[in-house]
């Protein structure tokens, strides 16, 4: 349960950042649901092409000085999250505007800890009114662009508490935040993802926080006095950083982390793992995920689902395809597709092979050769190619293109059709091994 899966895990809403909690068959059999979280903070990001409202960025929200308005805005966002079966938005962003060259300043509220805390507390409370969690981030002290994933933020305790922690304290105590994301990099030499002082002493014991803590995506941790390394995850467990984000498959331990080895060596205990699991379960029991698993959908969600626009993509009901375990090929049967002008099909695919694929389209059209029939292909909502054929007068032809799927095992392929009178027999994705 320590490992979250992503990005774009097929176990939760399509195109989202991560799944956590009940993400194995064993845990699901125990009645533990899979929780879902999605980027923010400026609205919901779903990489499969599902529409969502784009919200004003954090700095603009700070400029309003209007907590009531911000709260109402994020109550609406909470309802949109419910519609898309997402349990937590990865936001608000709370880093202080220390360096004007920080490339992510637009996500954050201001240089003022009080304003930051109050605006973010309003966002948290707004989403809670819709039954949604929010993950306040990044905890804490990561405020520059150069070396953003590795820098060490050195500061006094007074500076830390009065500037860089104060906004988080307000969001927890006044807003009731139930999820926190730690940073990349370190504070005073210890990487925040494995800092017991931050994740337990201050956050939980001093502020009374009772939710979950997760890492930033692919963050590292270190043993005090040592360099941070990818396999070093046991300090996260000990610090009460409950969820490491993310791996492609939680059961197989693809990053070869040291949790089991350090458990056997007595460096961490089964009690610490159980404590962290309890935190995750507590979060899920208060989230929409538990109701979705039980098949209980509120009237508000049903109303919103019925109000979808005709061209909206329903991220919860996509066709899911998995590569053949022997050949690693992925076959998209033409019967699954709807090739007509203006239509789009989105499919969730899971590939074990990482690298280039030959994408072989078998298509025909009854039109004459003067006709042009384009099909645009998007991978994770990014345009990759357009395959255009002429009319074939009823003869099946094949067109082959190269598509790289070298990053991650879960993707969303969108096909957009620019013309009528096109028939697709199949689309076959074949790994390029030579």
Give residue spans per PLM region.
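Glycoside hydrolase catalytic-domain context in secreted enzymes
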Residues: 1-352, 356-360, 374-398, 402-406, ...
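A short local loop/turn or secondary-structure capping micro-motif enriched for an aromatic residue
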Residues: 368, 392-396, 422-423
